[in-house]
Curated annotation (Swiss-Prot):
GO biological-process terms attached to the record: protein sumoylation
Gene: SAE1
Official protein name in the record: SUMO-activating enzyme subunit 1
Residues carrying N-acetylvaline: 2
Cystine connections: none
UniProt cross-references to SUPFAM superfamilies, sorted A to Z: Activating enzymes of the ubiquitin-like proteins
Role summary: The heterodimer acts as an E1 ligase for SUMO1, SUMO2, SUMO3, and probably SUMO4. It mediates ATP-dependent activation of SUMO proteins followed by formation of a thioester bond between a SUMO protein and a conserved active site cysteine residue on UBA2/SAE2.
Database matches in InterPro entries: ThiF/MoeB/HesA, ThiF_NAD_FAD-bd, Ubiquitin-activating_enz, UBQ/SUMO-activ_enz_E1-like
Pathway: Protein modification; protein sumoylation
């Protein structure tokens, strides 16, 4: 009997059983790429927990959870990896036990140092880096490091009912499965002289493609003054501008909007909205004032959706299967829908 490890080219019998459904879904080669991938996940709040869960279950080789913050009283509301009574512990350390139990085959590690103190050499051990809960300056800096070292970069956050993801994969090559269309002439059903296209779901072909991404800095600094940009502005989701406002709030206050200081934070958010959108050269009314009612705290259902999307994009990028989101994904929990936006210099 041939061992599955030999037949699978590096996938053991135990792994073949564990990842059987995924191997059937996206193929053995894609799963082997996942099993060889190291991922850094920064920020272990509610969104980070969802991303960690999905990546661990997908079967990456290793996941490093980095967070220098302590568990707050409100964290367990959306962070299911943290046990009750963990307030005051480091968030990453408090998440380790449950995270590792999800899949013992994945090497789950913890890092409690501030991401801002990490040298460039730290990031080169990873195939993909995903940031949550980070300032705009950190996001831009790490994205530049990842681009320089050909590391796949992702970032995302959840603010109340709203969430976003962003990816910079540089020049990314992937394969997409396409169903063959067979030309059938003289179809009996349609008459002897009729030609029709018949979709044969049993025949598929793998098509290689390439897509080029821009940096997060370029995506956040779109020049809206050109005629082309003004035309695109009408189709751009307000959530893009909401993200700009919330990242500026995080930079100015060193935290996200808090329900404990709702009145004060709401006033500041409106002022930041006016300043940020004026600086971008767009009308502040593009982001209606009632946005302040829906962007406080992390909501578990929104974390689940955005975390699922972000983890899926990481898996797709590492496995080089299927078209990636280029480059933003915005989720509006009030409307219950999401949209992919490609924003940048072009």
């Amino acid at each position: 009997m041939v061992e599955k490890e030999e037949a699978g080219g590096g996938i053991s019998e135990e792994e073949a059983a564990q990842y059987d459904r995924q191997i059937r879904l996206w193929g053995l080669e894609a799963q082997k790429r996942l099993r060889a991938s190291q991922v850094l996940l920064v920020g272990m709040k509610g969104l980070g927990a969802e991303i960690a869960k999905n990546l661990i279950l997908a079967g990456v080789k290793g996941l490093t959870m980095l967070d220098h913050e302590q568990v707050s009283p409100e964290d367990p509301g959306a962070q299911f990896l943290i046990r009750t009574g963990s307030v005051g512990r480091n968030r990453a350390e408090a998440s380790l036990e449950r995270a590792q139990n999800l899949n013992p085959m994945v090497d789950v590690k913890v890092d409690t140092e501030n991401i801002e103190k990490k040298p460039e050499s730290f990031f080169t051990q990873f195939d993909a880096v995903c940031l949550t809960c980070c300032s705009r300056d950190v996001i831009v800096k790490v994205d530049q490091i990842c681009h320089k070292n050909s590391i796949k970069f992702f970032t995302g956050d959840v603010f109340g009912y709203h969430g976003y993801t962003f990816a910079n994969l540089g020049e990314h090559e992937f394969v997409e499965e396409k169903t063959k269309v067979a030309k059938v002439s003289q179809g009996v059903e349609d008459g002897p002289d009729t030609k029709r296209a018949k979709l044969d779901s049993s025949e598929t072909t793998m098509v290689k493609k390439k897509v080029v991404f821009c940096s997060v800095k370029e995506a956040l600094e779109v020049d809206w003054s050109s005629d082309k940009a003004k035309a695109a502005l009408k189709r751009t989701t307000p959530d893009y501008f909401l993200l700009q406002v919330l990242l500026k709030f995080r930079t100015d206050k060193g935290r996200d909007p808090s329900s404990d200081t709702f009145g004060e934070d709401s006033e500041l958010l409106l002022q930041i909205r006016n300043d940020v959108l004026d600086a971008l050269g767009v009308n502040p009314d593009l982001l209606p004032e009632d946005f302040v009612r829906y962007c406080f705290s992390e909501m578990a259902p929104v974390c689940a959706v955005v975390g699922g999307i972000l983890a899926q994009e990481i898996v797709k990028a590492l496995s080089q299967r299927d078209p990636p989101h280029n480059n933003f994904f915005f989720f509006d929990g009030m409307k219950g829908n999401g949209i992919v936006e490609c924003l940048g210099p072009n």
